């Protein structure tokens, strides 16, 4: 009995506080070590039964250094009106609800993108601000490296760039934009790129920043791969994707050419001026009617 109690206290001393409830509930059996610490979370390797997985512990809002979080939260739907009002007022309850939405956004995005055919870690649930998910491994059974730690040949860079662009397209077709995609948020396993870190993923239709964020995501990835294959830098991939998306012509299987359609027709200045004059005339008429009614 004493030995069991002593063992429990040793486990508690070694285990991060936020992971203790998961151990007590049997969700996690053992914390194996810290994998990395980033701007919005700390990631641990954990044992869950016979499997080794990741436990992503989100940092409190006050400790997170993620810039301009409000831009990412725009358009996120809150079904409960009480929660929505509380979040607008900034009450403690509202802040707690905002935090819960931020933490659940990643697991929701992972499920959605996996169903859309995007290569992301398999999620196993989010428990009190801790996301349990698949640990991505390389062909030798080691933790998969990030893209920025891998040296590529020009051929491999072109191939992997095309793979990532296809995943960006599938994400957009599923209604999401990553919002923080770079060589630091892509892992490389024995199959190829795996996209990670999605708590800031945004609703492409509801967020006014979607186009700018998509362009930044694509630019980041193209610039990185372009170090190894400079010909990629000549492509207009972001504009091509968004152009097709706006037209309703983008599908999960769309193949990019890196070329955009440019309207070379001369501007019809006369028609534009007529529309402006008509608008002014309509406004003057409206003001005249208002004055007559006074």
Label the model's feature ranges.
Residues 173-179, 183:
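Catalytic-loop of the protein kinase fold
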Residues 142-152:
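AlphaC helix of the protein kinase catalytic domain
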Residues 99-102, 127, 153-160, 210, ...:
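Residue-level preference for long, well-ordered alpha-helices that form the structural scaffold
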Residues 129, 185-188, 237-244:
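A glycine-rich phosphate-binding loop feature that marks nucleotide/adenosyl-phosphate handling sites
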Residues 1-37, 155, 159, 163, ...:
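Regulatory N- and C-terminal appendages and interdomain linkers associated
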